[in-house]
A protein has these predicted regions:
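Hydrophilic extracytoplasmic domains
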Residues: 207-256
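Generic alpha-helix signal with a bias toward terminal, lower-confidence helices
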Residues: 31, 133-135, 144, 164-166, ...
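Surface-exposed beta-strand edges and their flanking turn/coil or helix-capping segments
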Residues: 85-86, 165-168, 204, 225-227, ...
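Short acidic, gly/pro-rich beta-turn/loop elements at beta-sheet edges
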Residues: 82, 142-143, 162, 213, ...
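Short, low-hydrophobicity acidic/polar segments
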Residues: 1-146, 180-189, 195-197, 205, ...
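Contiguous ligand/interfacial binding patches
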Residues: 147-196, 202-222
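Generic secondary-structure microfeatures
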Residues: 134-138, 156, 240
Length: 256
């Protein structure tokens, strides 16, 4: 019996992640718990046609009565060697929507039976979403901020991750770098980051960098909002940082 796959994505976002036609995802099927490799189906490639997912090869149930675990992830990586340590790297320059969306990692699983219809895994976000809102303080107007080539960078962060598809655990790894955030509007910026402790955000205005130091551990699948206020003082421009807002919810949109 052939099997199909339907997915949906959880839930709230600064910029909803919508999968485009032609997007590719990977899927594993395991009958006795997920193994690093050697599962019933290992890393089959599925392509999204705008409505549903299709495979080049027909995916078959082992039989007509045994339930199986379905584990899916996006984007597809043909070189995966270990389903419990799947490598993923976020983009350093997320200033374009294409690069921003490409930095999102989705994963999910479901337990299905041959007579129960299509497996329907819910895809969760493996990365963390950091939103920085910039406010005009004393001596500034919003128009002045907007005209100053405003930008935001998340600095000194791990760019790579290893994801365990069985439980969604994410371990930061690799080199340290800086992420240029995506401007969702003139005064709001969003970056997708590997889950880790964030210690530094830089606001750029009129080609001058203003560094903000702090410490906040950002968990996978959560959106954090940070408000930064620029104000003019007798000594120049000062930058103050407000508290983080943890939505406690997955960020994302709906695949339809």
């Amino acid at each position: 019996m052939a099997m199909g796959l339907l997915t949906e994505v959880c839930a709230v976002a600064a910029t909803p992640i919508m999968l485009a036609k032609g997007s590719k995802a990977g899927v594993y099927v395991a009958y006795d718990g997920l193994k690093s490799s050697g599962n019933y189906i290992d890393n089959a490639c599925l392509t999204f046609d705008g409505t549903k997912w299709n495979s080049e090869n027909v995916l078959q149930w082992k039989d007509n009565y045994t339930s199986a675990a379905f584990l899916a992830y996006y984007p597809y990586n043909e070189n995966v060697k270990n389903a419990k340590a799947l490598p993923f790297t976020v983009k350093t320059d997320q200033s374009t929507k294409e690069a921003y969306v490409a930095s999102d990692f989705l994963y999910g699983n479901s337990w299905s039976h041959p007579v129960g219809g299509f497996p329907k895994p819910v895809l969760h976000h493996g990365m963390t979403n950091i939103v920085v809102n910039v406010k005009a303080g004393d001596g500034f107007s919003e128009d002045e901020l907007k005209q100053g080539n405003l930008g935001v960078h998340v600095k000194n962060v791990y760019m790579q991750a290893n994801v365990n598809l069985e439980n969604g655990e994410v371990n930061a790894s690799g080199s340290i770098g800086s992420i240029k955030a995506y401007a969702t509007n003139a005064l709001s910026f969003s970056a997708i980051v590997v889950p880790q402790e964030i210690r530094k955000v830089t606001v750029v205005w009129n080609n001058v960098e203003y560094d903000l130091g702090f410490s906040k551990y950002c968990e996978r699948g959560r959106l954090y909002t940070l408000t930064v206020t620029l104000k003019k003082t007798s000594g120049g421009i000062s930058v103050t940082i407000g508290g983080w807002e943890d939505s406690g919810e997955d960020f994302g949109g709906t695949v339809n």
